[in-house]
Amino acid sequence: MAVIYNWFNDRLEIQAVADDITAKYVPPHVNLFYCLGGITLTCFLIQVATGFALTFYYRPTVGEALSSVRSIMLDTNFGWLIRSVHRWCASMMVLMMVLHVFRVYLTGGFKNPRESTWVTGVIMASCTVSFGVTGYSLPWDQVGYWAVKIVTGVPEAIPVIGPAIVQLLRGNSSVGQATLTRFYSLHTFVLPLLTAVFMLGHFLMIRKQGISGPL
């Protein structure tokens, strides 16, 4: 093992990277509340893993969505467990994200020079809420259908561009297959990609600037 490790270390400087990570200074005022961001990250990774597993059995059509969810819960091996973890971890992710935002705000972590870190965090918070809205509709039951109809109808009150936004969200004049396809694409591809990109930037900035000091 030492030979293999040394081979990679000579080329990639693994030990230098490890030393940099483990030697990073942690301010003495840091407490458990500073772990909320890491817990949110953990929830996101669990969501990615369980969501990926669910895509093997979920069918994003208005005629088969609900029946495929029932099949996952009743017929698929450990399907009930994976979907339950996905569902409850989604709620946990939202809760941890909200608490993390409050912690950062109350401790002044958004101030100079960490404004960009705050902005990326707000964008990820918006993505998290969007995850909830789009995921809620995927079973395409009565609750999901009417939730989509209400949510996509809200922008209609915006002057001039409101109807165009509704058309863009629904993919049609009414809620249907095009809407479900859009929400499925957003939930499984667009939002995870955006979240991952901004999360990378978020952590790189934290790594560069360090944890903010006490008030």
From Swiss-Prot:
Heme c binds at C35. PROSITE patterns: CYTB_NTER (PS51002). The keyword Nucleotide-binding does not apply. It is a multi-pass membrane protein. CDD domains: Cytochrome_b_N (cd00284). It is found in: Plastid, Chloroplast thylakoid membrane. Coiled coil: none annotated. Heme b 1 binds at H100, H202. Heme b 2 binds at H86, H187. The chain crosses the membrane at residues 32-52, 90-110, 116-136, 186-206. Its cofactor is heme b; heme c. One of its GO terms (cellular component) is chloroplast thylakoid membrane. InterPro entries: Cyt_b/b6_N, Cyt_B6_PetB, Cytb/b6-like_sf, Cytochrome_b_N_euk/bac, Di-haem_cyt_TM. One of its GO terms (biological process) is photosynthesis. Keywords: Chloroplast, Electron transport, Heme, Iron, Membrane, Metal-binding, Photosynthesis, Plastid, Thylakoid, Transmembrane, Transmembrane helix, Transport. It comes from the Eukaryota. Heme 1 (or BH or b566) is high-potential and absorbs at about 566 nm, and heme 2 (or BL or b562) is low-potential and absorbs at about 562 nm. HAMAP family: Cytb6_f_cytb6. Belongs to the cytochrome b family. PetB subfamily. PANTHER family: CYTOCHROME B. This is Cytochrome b6. It comes from Bigelowiella natans (Pedinomonas minutissima).
